[in-house]
């Protein structure tokens, strides 16, 4: 184990601690499992800190390091504050990459995955994250997916899991179904890059639409979520309130009436066209009703163009890609008694609403574009304020050209215009009358679709269904779970492997005993990750999915850390499963995550050859200083060593393809894990992108080194040492502690200032971690360490200085745990025996709360320092004095003085500043150490 952590040790540079002690401390740091056995004491505060578990790709990247550093920092603080903390780690282990790797490396997906898990576990331990390793789980282990299958059966029994034939996205290369979100904007597969095809297949779904309202409404009960993420969820669910309006077919041959969903029923008189999707269910009937073969050929050509656009642009909607087709057919509208032309438009989606819309170009941007392309008339039907109407008329007169703005809504009067017999009626009255006459019907519509969970892949959770010709789809009995994946297989990657394994697929029907077959689809990996946070709380339970008692005590998760890329689907699916399990009375909570912390990307310079535009590895980049022949000035150029071409530099997300990734192990080998984690937390707020900067990590290393020097210098000053600057054999007398009874006035003030800053820092660091502004907490620690470093030699002999060093060391623990552990032990154990009674014994309860327990040299057992109220009371404050914004002095004044203006104006040092001048304004502000006052003067 020592070899695994050697890199962390050698970068600490601690001269007074031998390697054996250092090794023991670090191993203690890695293997401590504070919460191996959960206490069942309900009076004990709980805290569940969770980072999104990784896919075991084999190598950690800096994005991983950042997310786990954040959750680890929070968990360490909460443990020190006395919370019963859950901070687990596991593996989201199913999925396509394992199958692809199995093909490339000629190993089974299981073997490849388990090797990667072992490797990444070691990497995480090298980073010294304090995870509860006893809770470790992997979604590809049968002990886990047995319960994923149990959830499926419960959903099936509740009518929330079902199978139906559906048009799916088919990847012709990977031979699998893709969810919509796995198809990029160009209509290509997210992994194979193949052009995705449409295919009809029977698929399994979870009925997430049944909870669309709860999933929307309950977002308002989550103050710990950002508005950005909540809005993303709401937009994905897409709830809207409106009405259904029917348009009657006037076709000669069979053609159904078309019903539209609209949120603006009051605009019915402004309808210029009826538009449907080119993929509408009635498209064949429409084709049959076209006037002649020439028109049908035009339709076929149009549909071909639409498919080409879809393959190229996917779901992107751009005016340039708008394609419409006038069928020449009309539909009758009973409300307006008008005949409306039927248009095909690729801006209408077949799977949203009814797949048809009524076009009101006077009051809708997209409708306006269709009308413009088809040369249809605009008819405004919503009244606008008179003043705005006049402005609009003036604008039209001035420009004398068509303006697109004419189709948009203005401030409405609430009354209809140009609406026949209904002109002048208020909107609400008009809609109510249509509802009463049953001409329109209220409808709530959702953009979200049911969750397609079927995947035609081998490496996933088997769906526990047996297909029988007599009995249909039969659920596997719970006592026969798990339905295990066959592990000893030869994987080729062609088609669905499970469908080819007759010995696994062919079984007896549990109901009738007839020959039957297993369902060969496996589950979407999002199913596995939709409930893993619950299993962490009882990961070894072989009798039930989890203990409801434990889950009810520790859920919901207090802080969930992960990337913004999972802000929609993973969170939505987890919320759905949580609500279902509550309905099943397995848990008490309906929302899984109290606080979401979505961290930003980790970025670094990307170098590209200016000619080929190909990424270049940093080792092949050279920085040259070149003098210009004309000006003689020096210019720095970035050159590709391999080609001699100039290099462009951009700051982008770290990735293998861009050759701009930073290997965490290399950084740990050079700087140590503590320095890396401190840098990550200090460099940028967690929600912002972190731009990698070598100078920044060097700065963090130097800061920790300075703290080490301060602590070692304090301890060394009590030793008898050989005088280095005196005669060779002359000895310098060791120092003695300085008690408060011997302080002079200046020393008394300096000690009070140190204690004030120390206790103020306790508040600042606590607040910074609780508010996830870790950089401000580290900045406060830097200020405190600088203050201690600059203290006068005599002050460094005081008990108060020693106590401040202890507090500083304790507060470093969430950020730099190994560093904190070693220095805490040193501050407790390495004091000379003659000094221990003065510095570290007989602490009051208040002192122990602030500076730790002197009888325990293990920082893991220490409590988080709490400020003492009396230490935050100051006799003097500093007053920064400015004139016209320029600082001219800093005065130390008694806290009893509150009239700063009078104090300055009566001070002889500043009288000349006011001579022959008239004060214009006086500004009072606050500073870190007191207040500021700024006098501005009137200009003559």
Curated annotation (Swiss-Prot):
Lineage, top-rank taxon, reads Eukaryota
Q: Does the keyword Ligase apply?
A: yes
Query: Which Gene Ontology cellular-component terms appear in the entry?
Result: mitochondrion
Into which EC class is this enzyme placed?
Answer: ligase
Q: Name one GO molecular function term.
A: leucine-tRNA ligase activity
Q: Which cellular compartments is it found in? A: Mitochondrion
The EC number(s) this enzyme carries: 6.1.1.4
Stretches the record annotates as Disordered: 724-744
UniProt motif ('KMSKS' region) ranges: 638-642
Q: Which residues bind ATP?
A: 641
What keywords does the record list, in alphabetical order? Answer: Aminoacyl-tRNA synthetase, ATP-binding, Ligase, Mitochondrion, Nucleotide-binding, Protein biosynthesis, Transit peptide
User: What InterPro entries would the database entry show?
Assistant: aa-tRNA-synth_I_CS, aa-tRNA-synth_Ia, Leu-tRNA-ligase, Leu_tRNA-synth_edit, M/V/L/I-tRNA-synth_anticd-bd, Methionyl/Leucyl_tRNA_Synth, Rossmann-like_a/b/a_fold, tRNAsynth_Ia_anticodon-bd
- Record bears the keyword Transcription: no
Which family would the database say this protein is a member of? Belongs to the class-I aminoacyl-tRNA synthetase family.
Q: Which NCBIfam families match?
A: leuS_bact (TIGR00396)
Please state what the protein is called: Leucine--tRNA ligase, mitochondrial
């Amino acid at each position: 184990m020592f070899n695994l952590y050697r890199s962390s040790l050698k970068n600490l540079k601690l001269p007074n601690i031998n390697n054996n002690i250092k090794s023991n401390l670090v191993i203690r740091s890695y293997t401590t499992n504070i919460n191996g056995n959960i206490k069942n004491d309900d009076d004990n505060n709980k805290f569940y800190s969770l980072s999104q578990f990784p896919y075991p790709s084999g190598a950690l990247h800096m994005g991983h390091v950042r997310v786990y550093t954040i959750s680890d920092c929070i968990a360490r603080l909460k443990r020190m504050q006395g919370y019963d903390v859950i901070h687990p780690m596991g593996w989201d282990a199913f999925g396509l990459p394992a199958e692809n790797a199995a093909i490339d490396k000629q190993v089974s997906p299981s073997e490849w995955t388990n090797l990667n898990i072992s490797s990444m576990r070691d990497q995480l331990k090298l980073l010294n994250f304090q995870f509860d390793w006893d809770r470790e789980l992997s979604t590809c282990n049968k002990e886990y997916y047995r319960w994923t299958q149990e959830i499926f059966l419960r959903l099936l029994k509740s009518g929330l899991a079902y199978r139906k034939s559906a048009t799916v996205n088919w990847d012709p290369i990977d031979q699998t179904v893709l969810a919509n979100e796995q198809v990029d904007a160009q209509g290509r597969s997210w992994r194979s890059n193949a052009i995705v095809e449409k295919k009809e297949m029977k698929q399994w779904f979870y009925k997430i639409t049944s909870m669309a309202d709860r999933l929307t409404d309950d977002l308002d009960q989550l103050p710990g979520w950002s508005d950005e993420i909540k809005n993303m969820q709401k937009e994905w669910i897409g709830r809207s309130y409106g009405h259904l309006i029917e348009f009657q077919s006037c076709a000669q041959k069979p053609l159904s009436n078309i019903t539209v969903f609209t949120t603006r029923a009051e605009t019915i008189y402004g309808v210029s066209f009826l538009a449907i999707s080119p993929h509408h269910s009635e498209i064949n009937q429409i084709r049959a009703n076209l006037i002649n073969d020439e028109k049908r050929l035009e339709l076929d050509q149009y549909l071909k163009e639409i498919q080409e656009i879809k393959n190229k642009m996917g779901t992107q909607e751009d005016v340039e890609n708008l394609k419409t087709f006038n069928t020449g057919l009309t539909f009758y509208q009973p409300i307006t008694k008008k005949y409306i032309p039927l248009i095909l438009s690729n801006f209408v989606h077949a799977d949203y609403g009814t797949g048809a819309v009524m076009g009101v170009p006077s009051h809708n941007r997209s409708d306006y574009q269709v009308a413009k392309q088809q040369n249809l008339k605009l008819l405004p039907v919503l009244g606008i304020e008179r003043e705005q109407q006049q402005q609009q008329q003036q604008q039209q007169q001035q420009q004398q050209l068509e303006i697109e703005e004419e189709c948009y809504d203005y401030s409405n009067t609430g009354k209809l215009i140009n609406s026949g017999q209904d002109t002048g009626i208020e909107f609400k009255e008009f809609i109510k009358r249509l509802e009463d006459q049953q001409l329109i019907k209220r409808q709530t519509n959702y953009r979200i679709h049911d969750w397609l969970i079927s995947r035609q892949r081998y490496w996933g959770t088997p769906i526990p269904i047996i297909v029988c010709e007599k009995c249909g789809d039969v659920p596997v009995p719970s006592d026969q779970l798990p339905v295990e994946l066959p592990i000893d297989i030869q994987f080729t990657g062609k088609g669905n492997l499970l469908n080819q394994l007759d010995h696994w697929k062919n079984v007896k029907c549990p109901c009738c005993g007839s020959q039957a077959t297993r369902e060969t689809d496996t589950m979407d990996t999002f199913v596995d990750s939709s409930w893993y946070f619950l299993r962490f709380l009882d990961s070894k339970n072989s009798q039930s999915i989890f203990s409801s008692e434990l889950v009810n005590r520790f859920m919901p998760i207090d802080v969930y850390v992960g990337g913004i890329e999972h802000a929609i689907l993973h969170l939505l699916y987890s919320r759905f499963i949580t609500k279902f399990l509550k309905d099943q009375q397995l848990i008490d909570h309906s929302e899984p995550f109290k606080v979401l912390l979505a961290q930003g990307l980790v970025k670094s310079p990307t170098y590209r050859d200016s000619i080929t535009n190909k990424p270049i590895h940093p080792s092949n980049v050279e920085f040259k200083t070149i003098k210009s022949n004309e000006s003689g000035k020096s210019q720095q150029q970035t050159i590709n060593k391999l080609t001699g071409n100039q290099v462009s530099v951009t700051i982008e997300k770290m990735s293998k393809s861009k050759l701009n990734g930073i290997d965490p192990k290399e950084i740990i080998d050079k700087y140590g894990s503590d320095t890396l984690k401190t840098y990550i937390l200090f460099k940028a707020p967690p929600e912002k992108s972190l731009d990698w900067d070598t100078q920044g990590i060097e700065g963090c290393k130097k800061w920790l080194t300075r703290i080490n020097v301060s602590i070692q210098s304090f301890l060394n000053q009590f030793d008898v040492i050989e005088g280095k600057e005196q005669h060779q054999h002359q000895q310098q007398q060791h120092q003695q502690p300085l008690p408060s009874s011997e302080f002079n006035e200046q020393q008394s003030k300096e000690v009070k200032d140190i204690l004030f800053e120390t206790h103020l820092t306790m508040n600042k660091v606590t607040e910074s971690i609780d508010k996830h502004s870790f950089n401000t907490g580290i900045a406060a620690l830097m200020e405190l360490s600088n203050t201690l470093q600059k203290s006068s030699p005599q002050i460094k002999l005081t008990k108060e200085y020693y106590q401040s060093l202890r507090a500083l060391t304790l507060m470093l623990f969430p950020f730099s745990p190994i560093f904190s552990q070693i220095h805490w032990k040193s501050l407790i154990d390495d004091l000379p025996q003659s000094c221990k009674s003065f510095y570290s014994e007989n602490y009051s309860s208040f002192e122990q709360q602030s500076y730790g327990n002197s009888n325990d040299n293990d920082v893991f057992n220490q409590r988080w320092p709490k400020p003492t109220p009396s230490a935050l009371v100051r006799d003097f404050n500093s007053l920064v004095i400015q004139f016209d914004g320029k600082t001219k002095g800093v005065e130390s004044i008694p806290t009893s003085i509150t009239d700063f203006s009078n104090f300055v104006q009566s001070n002889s040092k500043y009288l000349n500043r006011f001579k022959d001048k008239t004060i214009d304004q006086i500004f009072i502000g606050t500073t870190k150490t007191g207040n500021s006052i700024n006098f501005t003067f009137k200009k003559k």
